[in-house]
Amino acid sequence: MNSLIEKIFADFKVDNKNIPVSFLKYNGQETTYITYQSIDNSGTLNADDEILGYIEYYDFDIFSKGNYLKIVREVKKIMKANGFMWQPSMSSGDMFEDDTGYYHKTLCFKKERMEE
């Protein structure tokens, strides 16, 4: 799934500004960036004692020193266009981290997967 997410977010831009998207941790210099991680696999579909499919959940953490609302909208849009469904009940409220000075928002998405 990570390769799909990396492909989806290759050259991700909001207002003509590149927004880096990294797995788990961002090590660059940009002050606006997104990290993502798998948080759960559940909701399995079983038949004849075999798993046929499941639901995979991913968190996307948006970090910014300024207004991030357009980024939130664009992430939701690109994820929906690629078959992911936003999970509002598993996403965070708006946060501000006093120790870093970053605004922070977590968006959770799910995608159904079928075993091959």
Regions found by a protein language model. Name each.
Residues 67-73:
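Short, conserved charged micro-motifs
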Residues 1-46, 77, 97-99:
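Small/polar-rich, solvent-exposed N-terminal microdomains that initiate assembly or binding
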Residues 43-45, 56-59, 81-85, 110:
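Short, surface-exposed linear patches
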Residues 26, 39-41, 65-67, 112-116:
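Generic structural motif
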Residues 52-66, 103-113:
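Oligomerization/assembly interface segments of phage tail-like spikes and tubes
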Residues 73-116:
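Acidic-leaning, charged glycine-interspersed low-complexity segments
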